[in-house]
Amino acid sequence: MNGKCERCGADVTKKNLRQWMLRITKYADRLLNDLDKLDWPEKVKKMQTDWIGKSYGAEVDFPVEGKDEKITVYTTRPDTLFGVTFMVIAPEHPLIDKYADKITNMDAIKAYRTECQKKTEFERTQLVKDKTGVKIEGLMGINPMNGKKIPIFIADYVMMGYGTGAIMAVPAHDQRDYDFAKAFGIDIIQVIKGGDISKEAYTGDGEMINSEFLNGFTNKKDSIARMVEEIKKMGVGEAGVQFKMKDWAFNRQRYWGEPIPLVHCPSCGVVAVPYEELPLELPDVKNFEPGEDGESPLAKIDSYVNCKCPKCGGDAKRETDTMPQWAGSSWYFLRYIDPNNDKAFADRKKICLLYTSPSPRD
């Protein structure tokens, strides 16, 4: 809460750690399409559809002035490109560290980053909150459609783990961008006719204006298609698809959890523990508190960590992170359908029947 641990009151900060991920995004289309095969309530299927969050749009490259560099953004509204008057990147964006020696207000950038590390993702992305951010002095973006220079900001509401970690801002037609532009005195250029942008952003449909070859278009779908055609011809972008669903971070820095059966070898890389050596069991220890370095408690147990590579026989180290609680809760209950089996965890046929038969006892 407010950057403090709710239990002990200590400062809470975020650290970047190497993660093991389950690539569930590979199955995004299948998960989405097969919802039609399920006899579920429509409101539940709607929740699943929104969670998967498939969207169609475009990836657009914004050059960085004077640098052999570009910032790529994903947008569902490429038709509003002529209305882009600034960009926002996540505080964690690698562009900042890459050009730290060119940025003249790095102290302010670092201070803002520190504050962001104290916030949860929910706190950072709330719509109803004061708009905060820092302009990156020393770097400017260029709108690829009109060649105009546009400022680049960092702000907490842009997350590195979502999209490309950067957004193009069209304040005339997005309320959050509008509020940000008002707070920082940034130009607001209307490209869709309607509303009163002196009071608020216009988020409805209408005739395209101030957009050169799109002027006069009234159909949003046609406007988007025409813009995608143009950015592709210019070599600054192409049509794209994105999902809200993210890959599953499948590791935790704690003692109590299923060990991840992988070995890190300096010669062979990451090697799986042989099947015949499974299950890999946790060592019996008295102190299982995590260290201040963020490493798993298992990392401090030399007798567990140090091992031989299953592939080359050389010195190696075990993976010390453990699986999340979902790993155990997703399968332990299957033992109940075959509790007396002393040859396997559960008979595969019975497991199949559990999912395919009206009654597993049949």
What residue spans do the PLM features occupy?
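Amphipathic alpha-helical
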Residues: 25, 30-53, 95-132, 290-298
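Catalytic alpha/beta core of large soluble enzyme barrels
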Residues: 93, 97-196
